[in-house]
């Protein structure tokens, strides 16, 4: 069986959805963190492999970006699901922050895509996907090994993602207003 960059992209998304449902939504943060970290590294391979094989192109970029959004949503939705179903003093914070983080994480990517479709650069942002995933991964480990910091991590993720969206809006506005 031949391994292709697109195959790695699909596999990474499917694995992330599985990890989210099987472990994160159940509060199994340690195994979830270990697998999330491992498959996060595998996710880096598709683009690298495509460039090495000379097969990188618009289709692969589109597929990777789209499935990355699905993966991101699966992780955050699984965490929201977990906190909806437990009774803790911080579960309401986790749910609200998770919803905001989900929306703003998706808006971060949308802002870049829309800017690029208008021939504007969108190269700013304090919390791009790598930073968001690193924050989630570290928070899963800390929550599993020490104390539950995930509600606060989701709050930080919501704030950082919101700041990133605002940065992108302002950055793109400068370009598009100057072009007009």
Residue ranges and their predicted role:
Residues 1-35, 40, 74-180:
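Hydrophobic alpha-helical transmembrane segments
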